Amino acid sequence: MTSSLVLILAPLALVAIGEAAFGNSSKIFEIPGLEVMASDKYPHFTTIETVSRTKVHRHRREVIAGQIYDWNSYEIPFQIWGGDYNFQSLIRRGIRMWEDSTCLRFKENQQSRDAIRYVLEKGDSCFTEYIGRNGGHQDIIIGSECAEEYVVAHETGHALGFWHTHQRPDRDRHISINWKNVMEEATASFMPFRSMLQAFGIRQVSPRRVPYDYGSLMHYHAVAHAVKVSDFTIVPKELKYVTTMGTEKMAFLDAKVINDIYCPNACQGRNHLNCLAGGYPDPNNCNVCRCPEGLGGPDCGRLQPSPCGGEIHASDQWQTLSSPSGRDVHCYWRISVPEGSRVRFRLSDGEFPCSYGCQSYVEIKHKLDVRLTGFRSCCYRPKEDTVSESNQIFVIYHPNGRTARFSLRFRRQA
């Protein structure tokens, strides 16, 4: 396989990942059109790929300067260098995030000369040396101070060929970059990747056509590489997505891109599924559909089962949906109206621990394309009503072990 790769991840000038050193240095600030709904004054965030000046200059020469390659098969050889049992378990859990959602299988092979190498180093630098397969040992450095499952998954995404979402050539339709607040040494991490390709002499790139997803694992959060964390570096055109960016979860479309590249025919002739709503036969089990979050059933036509959600039909009168009690519940609701109508809704109340990338949140999927991550609210909620693009919305509630609550007002709009 030598087809040129994807449009969802890494900067060409190498970078590091670290736990934010200034998580409590800036209070939550006001944003026009949004209302604060946080239960704390200080937002928490981890900084995906905080630039290390030393690492950038040391490794710049190693950036791939030719065609970007896929791996030869869905079996990816890997090695782990250094670290104790806990570190090695962490690496395997990060890898498993890809295996659980895709056909990829990572095979540990200490003898392979063409493999991903996960290397433990002291410090707060985590980075990938190449985008896509380079045809030799490909090091992913995991610093002891930034070793997290999602960091491993994010950096592995780079090795699989992903660019950052916010570096897509169409990104200006979805986000704005506040250049005056971007650290000078991080500039390359915010350039559109076509500019980076030209700078490094890479000419052949064939982007996979997937819509822009604020909830991609490969998207920086709003204050990434900020000179001052009291201001954003990445501003979504739709401000209600401001805390959706920077998630620690894999998005439905992240996995789909990989499955389209490495195993597009895995279930061909093995099933007669008619998957709806952008779902597709699961390459890990061809008897079921892999569905966007919120949908389930044999063909993605039903609501994803949960002990606390359900189907709700909106009327012409305002109704209210309130979150159930409990810190560990996971709830899915579908609010629908007849074809030709829309759902008008607004988060009327709520309280969550604030974090960029929302670890505890209520998510509302109101777009026509239900594959896209909805807007996740944990720090802010829109002050005005929102109207759905179709005759349904999905409400997803994940407190994730934290104290949280929300109320949603909704009604039918003809």
UniProtKB/Swiss-Prot annotation:
Which residue pairs form cystines in this protein?
C103-C263, C126-C146, C267-C286, C289-C300, C308-C331, C358-C378
For the ligand (Zn(2+)), the binding residues are H154, H158, H164
Q: What is its EC number?
A: 3.4.24.-
List the active site.
E155
Q: What is its main location?
A: secreted
Task: Please state every residue range assigned to the domain named EGF-like.
Answer: 251-307
Record bears the keyword Glycoprotein: yes
* GO terms, molecular function: metalloendopeptidase activity; zinc ion binding
Which locations, inside or outside the cell, does it occupy? Secreted
Keyword Iron-sulfur set for record: no
Record domain CUB: where:
308-414
Q: Which Gene Ontology biological process is one annotated for this entry?
A: proteolysis
Q: Which PROSITE patterns match?
A: ASTACIN (PS51864), CUB (PS01180), EGF_1 (PS00022)
Describe the location of the Peptidase M12A domain by residue ranges: 62-264
- List the transmembrane segments: none
A Pfam entry, by short name: Astacin
Signal peptide region: 1-20
Q: Using the UniProt annotation, give the residues that carry a glycan (glycosylation sites).
A: N24
Cofactor binding summary note: Binds 1 zinc ion per subunit.
Instruction: Give the species this sequence originates from.
Output: Caenorhabditis elegans
Enumerate the cofactors the protein uses: Zn(2+)
Q: What does this protein do?
A: Metalloprotease.
Keywords from UniProt, A to Z, are: Cleavage on pair of basic residues, Disulfide bond, EGF-like domain, Glycoprotein, Hydrolase, Metal-binding, Metalloprotease, Protease, Secreted, Signal, Zinc, Zymogen
Q: Supply the enzyme class, top level.
A: hydrolase
UniProt propeptide residues:
21-61
Name-wise, this protein is: Zinc metalloproteinase nas-26
- InterPro entries to which the protein is assigned, alphabetical: Astacin-like_dom, CUB_dom, MetalloPept_cat_dom_sf, Metallopeptidase_nem, Peptidase_M12A, Peptidase_Metallo, Sperma_CUB_dom_sf
